[in-house]
Amino acid sequence: MMTRKSAMIGSLVVLGAALLLSRWTGTRDKDWPVPVEAAKLKNPVKATPENLAAARAIYMDKCANCHGEKGFGDGPEAGMYDPPPASLADASMMNGMPDGEIYWKITEGRKPMPSFKNQLSDEQRWQLVNFLRTLVPKPPAKKPGAIKP
């Protein structure tokens, strides 16, 4: 016959296993819903060399400690957070997000990422959107006259 203590221990083991399984199966960052209207926003800031340089300085000050200098999510503080910072150099993720969605995420934040709406101006946040686009590796250029596979 199972004692009350055994039942309690068994329940804790099952609960712990369920928590570990949910973390292991990658449920951490699949959904970060953005309002439809926010995703439709267009970037009013041009990606000029001056704006990109300003955004790089902001990124190095506000973002690189977590997301890493090149955006791989490997900054010196990345290991302190659960879930870990996203790789901003992930082409499939970044190319799937319109500028308005990136801007909204920078603006609103989500634990553990802070909101930057009171730390950075609208222009600075849009500059960051342009800079983040530069972190995504470009596909190799096709050679003229190359045969398609």
Model-assigned labels for residue ranges:
Residues 2-11:
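Bacterial N-terminal signal peptides that target proteins for export
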Residues 11-18:
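Bacterial N-terminal signal peptides
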Residues 20-30:
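Bacterial Sec-dependent signal peptides at the C-terminal "C-region" and cleavage site
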Residues 28-58, 142-143, 147-149:
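Electrostatic cytochrome c docking/interface patches
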Residues 31-34, 76-81:
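Short, flexible, mixed-charge acidic loops at enzyme active sites
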Residues 49-72, 78, 102-108:
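Sequence/structural segment immediately N-terminal to covalent heme-attachment motifs in c-type
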Residues 72-73, 122:
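Short, non-ligating residues that shape and space the ligands of small metal-coordination modules
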Residues 80-135:
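Extracytoplasmic electron-transfer domains, predominantly the class I c-type cytochrome c fold
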